[in-house]
């Protein structure tokens, strides 16, 4: 629904865009690859609290689940995200029979952004590990009281089968999660920016997060962007990664921004977003906003803000805490 006009807008995926559930974009399910050898050899099991976003699903509402957690291998942007895009496209474009969709393997590879010129072996080496990681990602819905616990455990994708000799792919989804694939709070994610950011996974991840935000978003804290990337390096190094990624997004023409400081906290003010990487005919529609003036903060408040940042507590975390009370 377009809030400005009241018109119902249908979002349809094609080769240049995909419909991505907002929850998966904001939560950081898909993150940059851990580059260092030290980090890459660590246990890369990822655990994400998805309660705020996914308790809106009818499954959670019907069963009264009040906690949702996503657990599984760390999903990267360069391969796993593109495979997930292919899965979304497959269910959107092909006839779903029961809980399964079937299509040619070569077409599925194309939907994942893999050139058809690659050999069958190369296709397998890229798609197979990604399908295993995505199918290995668990979503658990639960509710616990003083005496009892109820829990429903499922997967991002229930099963995947392919046969390159027969040129076939079969994907199976949990019917109770079809709503996640067709979430009513979704945005049309342009793939043009993703393609322009090849091998720049941090910029790709921040793009999926920023593109999921509403129009004229509030300033985004540096800490929030660090959390979205879910890196394991020291904070100062993570800050450098975030700033470099933001600059890469500006270089491809996706956005413009200003970095400001309020007290001890750094923020990014987004002036405009251009997922098509070109200016619209009427640039006034972008409503560029000037950066908000820095607020005067007392020394006592500055100390409190510094302590929160040191503990890794963001303003978003505080807002969630107050809402839950």
From Swiss-Prot:
Its GO biological process annotations read: DNA replication initiation; plasmid maintenance
Superkingdom of origin? Bacteria
**Function of the molecule:** This protein is essential for plasmid replication; it is involved in copy control functions. In vitro, binds to the DNA repeat units, BCDD'D'', EFG and HIJ.
- UniProt entry keywords in alphabetical sequence: DNA replication, DNA-binding, Plasmid, Plasmid copy control
Q: Name one GO molecular function term.
A: DNA-directed DNA polymerase activity
Q: What is this protein called?
A: RepFIB replication protein A
Please give the InterPro entries that the UniProt record associates with this protein.
Answer: Initiator_Rep_WH1 (IPR000525), WH-like_DNA-bd_sf (IPR036388)
Could you say which protein family the record assigns here? Belongs to the initiator RepB protein family.
